[in-house]
C-alpha cells in the first residue's frame, strides 16, 4: 500500500490484513480522490479540511487526506493491532501532529471537539450499527455547512439512509461500493 497523491505521494504505508480489518485498496482510494478533485456535484475542499476517519483500521484514507493538505484527522478505531500500525505510519510519515488516535467505539463518544468537513466511514461490511452512528453524528451537528460523507460498503449492501443522508453519488469498484452523501 502507498500514498497516492499530495506531499507524501509514493510513500509506503504499513498495513495489517486480518479478519478484523480490510484496508481500502489503493485503486479504490485513488478513485475516491479523483472524484473529490474533479466532480461537479461535490464541492468540499480537502486543503485545510477537518476530516473524521471512522472505523479507520490502519487509516489509509485519513493518511491520504493529510498528504493532500487536510488540517487535522481524528482516527477512530477499536482494533489494537490496526491502531499500532496506524500510530507507526503517522510517526514514519511525520504527520502525527495533525492526527488524533481515538481507541473507542463511535457510539461511546458523546462529545466531539470540532465540526468536520469530511466524514469517512469504513465499517465492517456486516455491521449495521453504523447507521445508528450516522444518526447520532447528524444529531450532534458536528458537520460544517460545506461537508461530505463518504461510506465504503460491500457492493450488494442495501442500507437505509432515509431521513439521514442525501445521496449524491454511488460508485462500484469490484466488491466495494463507495457512497458520497450529505447530512439531510
Where would I find each of the regions flagged by the language model?
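Class I S-adenosyl-L-methionine-dependent methyltransferase catalytic core
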Residues: 1-184
Amino acid at each position: 500500500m502507498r500514498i497516492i497523491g499530495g506531499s507524501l505521494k509514493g510513500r509506503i504505508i504499513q498495513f495489517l490484513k486480518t479478519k478484523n480489518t480490510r484496508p481500502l485498496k489503493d485503486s479504490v482510494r485513488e478513485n475516491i480522490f479523483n472524484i473529490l478533485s474533479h466532480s461537479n456535484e461535490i464541492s468540499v475542499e480537502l486543503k485545510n479540511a477537518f476530516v473524521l476517519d471512522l472505523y479507520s483500521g490502519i487509516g489509509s484514507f485519513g493518511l491520504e487526506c493529510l498528504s493532500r493538505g487536510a488540517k487535522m484527522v481524528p482516527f477512530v478505531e477499536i482494533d489494537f493491532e490496526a491502531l499500532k500500525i496506524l500510530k507507526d505510519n503517522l510517526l514514519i510519515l511525520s504527520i502525527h501532529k495533525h492526527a488524533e488516535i481515538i481507541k473507542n467505539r463511535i457510539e461511546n463518544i458523546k462529545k466531539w471537539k470540532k465540526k468536520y468537513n469530511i466524514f469517512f466511514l469504513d465499517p465492517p461490511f456486516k455491521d449495521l450499527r453504523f447507521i445508528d452512528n450516522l444518526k447520532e453524528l447528524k444529531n450532534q451537528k458536528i458537520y460544517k455547512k460545506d461537508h461530505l460523507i463518504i461510506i465504503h460498503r460491500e457492493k450488494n449492501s442495501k442500507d437505509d439512509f432515509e431521513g439521514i443522508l442525501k445521496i449524491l453519488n454511488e460508485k462500484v469498484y469490484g466488491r466495494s461500493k463507495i457512497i458520497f452523501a450529505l447530512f439531510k
